[in-house]
């Protein structure tokens, strides 16, 4: 149960942060956001704000999306002769077009629609008491569709494709950008929780309670200078010296550790402890505890995580295998394991997954943010927009590829995790 809760929390935070980036910068760029959705499939919860954006929580934890005006099949069609009820504002502009038999306004004006333009001229024409009349439509008017769903009209100036290149570019990049920011923030938080960043350049050590070094008298922040005569000036030196000193070591044998404590040099016999096939002496790298050190430590962890992910991506390109990929099932399995290991493991997983999601979404596949960014760049270079039909076909092909890949990855994860 703890694993499921952890998975839902991590998944929810990653998706909300990613989609909020798209949502925020779409709004800033003047694009009408139709829907902000968390998850896929049937709606569990929905709410419409005053700006006409529908917020939904959906059943399947397979991602999320921000649906913008002008994307896909976004136009509302009103057939000639359709009965409608018009609600006018104080200026005489239509503020609501009701095509349903629900949400009726007793003050509304009945009309049989004969023509309309809700994108450019913003007008609606029809028969009112057997007389043809045309009314201006307010820029933020809404339509109540036949099923009772109320949505805002989308004039050309609030549609995605009519926003500036810069606006569309930052809107598409904002999702991955938010994931990178989240990853960095969580890694910094992790370093603060741990008390600092390990200092691998130093030979000062932290001593593990009841470990071999503690039993021999070493204390936190003591400085190990030699092990069995091997000089130690850094953490790497220390691990190499332990490895060399414990080769062919007998069960009851000890090694000589020379260390400096309170400016005094001491040499003690330490009996290493064997874990699997390696020996340890119960010490860890000392921590850099300054505020600046912690901030830089978080950035260092984020960069290291990104570098690891990029190397894995490179390996995937040179030698593709489904076993190198993971979907929601693998994410659940990792969340479950992290939950068993405590808060720090959960935060570390969240940070890595967030950076991973950011990098993955920048891959220039049409269905991903990277594909949209690539089309924005091509449009900027050509100085003319890509045809909507062409962009739609390219995106559809990308979606098909991603759906097939997701099914294959999920099936592979199920077989690997549960069987």
From Swiss-Prot:
Bilayer-spanning residue ranges: 169-191, 301-323, 343-365, 392-411
Domain of life: Bacteria
EC number: 3.4.24.-
GO MF term (any one): metalloendopeptidase activity
Pfam families from the UniProt entry: PDZ_6, Peptidase_M50
Keyword terms: Cell membrane, Hydrolase, Membrane, Metal-binding, Metalloprotease, Protease, Transmembrane, Transmembrane helix, Zinc
InterPro entries, per database record: PDZ_6 (IPR041489), PDZ_sf (IPR036034), Pept_M50_Zn (IPR004387), Peptidase_M50 (IPR008915)
GO biological process terms held by the UniProt record: proteolysis
GO annotations of cellular component type: plasma membrane
Top-level EC class: hydrolase
Residues engaged in binding Zn(2+): 18, 22
Co-factor requirement: Zn(2+)
Disulfide bonding pattern of the chain: none
Primary localisation category: membrane
Bilayer topology term: Multi-pass membrane protein
Domain PDZ, chain residue ranges per copy: 175-274
Catalytic residues identified in the record: 19
Protein family membership: Belongs to the peptidase M50B family.
UniProt-recorded name of the protein: Putative zinc metalloprotease M6_Spy1682
Organism from which the protein derives: Streptococcus pyogenes serotype M6 (strain ATCC BAA-946 / MGAS10394)
Organism placement in taxonomy: Bacteria, Bacillati, Bacillota, Bacilli, Lactobacillales
């Amino acid at each position: 149960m703890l694993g499921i809760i952890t998975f839902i929390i991590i998944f929810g935070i990653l998706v909300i942060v990613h989609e909020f980036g798209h949502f925020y910068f779409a709004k800033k760029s003047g694009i009408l956001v139709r829907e902000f959705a968390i998850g896929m499939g049937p709606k569990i919860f929905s709410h419409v704000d005053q700006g006409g954006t529908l917020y939904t929580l959906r059943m399947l934890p397979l991602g999320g999306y921000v649906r913008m005006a002008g994307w896909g099949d976004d136009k509302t069609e009103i057939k000639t002769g359709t009965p409608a009820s018009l609600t006018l504002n104080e200026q005489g502009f239509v503020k609501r077009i009701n095509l349903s038999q629900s949400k009726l306004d007793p003050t509304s004006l009945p009309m049989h629609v004969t023509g309309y333009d809700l994108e450019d001229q913003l007008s609606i024409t029809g028969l009112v008491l057997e007389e043809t009349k045309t009314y201006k439509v307010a820029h933020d008017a809404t339509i109540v569709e036949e099923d009772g769903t109320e949505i805002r009209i989308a004039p050309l100036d609030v549609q995605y494709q009519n926003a500036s290149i810069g606006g569309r570019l930052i809107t598409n990049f904002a999702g991955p950008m938010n994931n990178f920011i989240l990853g960095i923030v969580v890694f910094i938080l992790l370093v603060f929780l741990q008390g600092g960043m390990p200092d691998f350049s130093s030979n000062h050590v932290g001593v593990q309670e009841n470990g071999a070094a503690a039993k021999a008298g070493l204390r936190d922040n003591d400085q190990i200078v030699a092990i069995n005569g091997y000089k130690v000036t850094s953490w790497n030196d220390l691990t190499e010296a332990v490895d060399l000193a414990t080769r062919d070591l007998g069960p009851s044998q000890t090694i000589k550790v020379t260390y400096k404590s309170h400016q005094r040099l001491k040499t003690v016999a330490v009996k290493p402890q064997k874990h699997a096939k390696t020996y340890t002496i119960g010490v860890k790298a000392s921590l850099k505890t300054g505020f600046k050190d912690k901030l830089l430590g978080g950035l260092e962890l984020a960069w290291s995580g990104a570098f690891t992910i990029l190397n894995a991506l490179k390996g995937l390109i040179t030698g593709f295998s489904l076993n190198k990929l993971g979907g929601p099932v693998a994410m659940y399995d990792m969340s479950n394991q992290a939950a068993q290991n405590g808060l720090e493991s959960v935060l570390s997983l969240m940070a890595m997954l967030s950076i991973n999601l950011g990098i993955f979404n920048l891959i220039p596949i049409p269905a991903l943010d990277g594909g949209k960014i690539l089309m924005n760049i091509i449009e900027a270079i050509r100085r003319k927009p890509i045809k909507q039909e062409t962009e739609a076909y390219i995106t559809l092909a990308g979606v098909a590829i991603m759906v097939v890949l997701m099914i294959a990855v999920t099936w592979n994860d199920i077989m690997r995790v549960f069987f």
